[in-house]
């Protein structure tokens, strides 16, 4: 390891610790490779960190396990874990953190969620008994012919993800910039039905602070969560946090729905059902969960 690399390595860890210590002081006074790694103990969550990439200085894992994603007329509750993972490298010229794709797993997990109401937006009347509502929604709508699931996918290479740990901890500015597209799954819609695309992604500028969206949306507040510093300062853990953004737009709407032959007819139908394209101030992302970052050399040493 060169002297310059050591200096950058120390600088990245130093910035993490300075930011974390500043928060703790008042209390006291975002393509898979074949490589496999087996970190242990507190470092076990980083098994897909790109440790084979010499540029990796920090390992990061963020798990979203609650929240919601609203685009146009549709709100999809987050009920399953969505994982964003990979590595970070500090650009010595810009001092910005560059994201490196995970090894052995997706950088952004392709987690399938149910779209309430399915393709037609139908739900059981609220006047029905709760158990009857649940049975109707689950088995007649969600698992019927009109049932739709969605997967939020990364729309650009992992290097397009921007993570600012300092902003995240101090609840100010953009903590995570994430370019995504939403895949809709239904037999009628085909295999390539998306809202947003790689050429026109939905850009989420997520913050743990307070948003300032255009009307009709109102400001909402995120949270960094509870901060812990472990393993002699080599591991930073944030739990119970919330990343939010309600200023983003979907500029493209649906594309590829119904397959190559029928997308010209099906895309407008999906746009009408979902209310897309949708302008800034009409969409919302709330991602609740945990984030962990660790010094890559410490992760390696735990194997």
Task: Identify the residue ranges that each predicted region occupies.
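Secretory targeting and sorting signals
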Residues: 1-35
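Extracytosolic secretory-pathway proteins
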Residues: 36-303
């Amino acid at each position: 390891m060169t002297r310059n690399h050591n200096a950058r390595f120390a600088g990245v860890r130093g910035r993490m610790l300075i930011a974390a210590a500043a928060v703790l002081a008042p209390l006291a006074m975002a393509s898979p490779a074949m490589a496999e790694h087996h970190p242990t103990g507190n470092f076990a969550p980083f098994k897909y960190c790109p440790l084979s990439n010499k540029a990796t200085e920090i390992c990061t894992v963020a798990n979203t396990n609650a929240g919601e994603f609203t685009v146009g007329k549709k709100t999809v509750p987050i009920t399953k874990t969505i994982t964003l993972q990979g590595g970070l490298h500090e650009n010595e010229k810009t001092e910005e953190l560059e994201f490196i794709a995970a090894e052995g797993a997706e950088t952004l997990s392709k987690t399938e969620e149910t779209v309430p109401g399915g393709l037609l937006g139908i739900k059981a009347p609220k006047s029905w008994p709760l158990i009857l509502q649940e049975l109707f929604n689950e088995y007649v709508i969600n698992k019927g012919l009109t049932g739709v699931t969605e997967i939020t996918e990364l729309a650009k290479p992992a290097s397009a993800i921007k993570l600012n740990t300092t902003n995240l901890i101090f609840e100010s500015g953009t903590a995570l910039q994430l370019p995504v597209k939403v895949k809709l799954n239904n037999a009628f819609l085909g295999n390539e039905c998306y809202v947003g695309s790689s050429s026109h992604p939905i850009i989420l500028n997520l913050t743990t602070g307070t948003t300032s969206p255009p009307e009709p949306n109102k400001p909402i507040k995120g949270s960094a969560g509870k901060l812990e510093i472990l393993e002699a300062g080599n591991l930073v853990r944030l739990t119970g946090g919330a990343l939010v953004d309600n200023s983003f737009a979907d500029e493209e709407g649906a594309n590829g729905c119904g397959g190559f032959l029928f997308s010209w007819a099906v895309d407008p139908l999906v746009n009408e059902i979902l209310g897309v394209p949708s302008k800034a101030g009409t969409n919302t992302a709330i991602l609740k969960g945990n984030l962990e970052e660790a010094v890559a050399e410490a992760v390696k040493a735990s194997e």
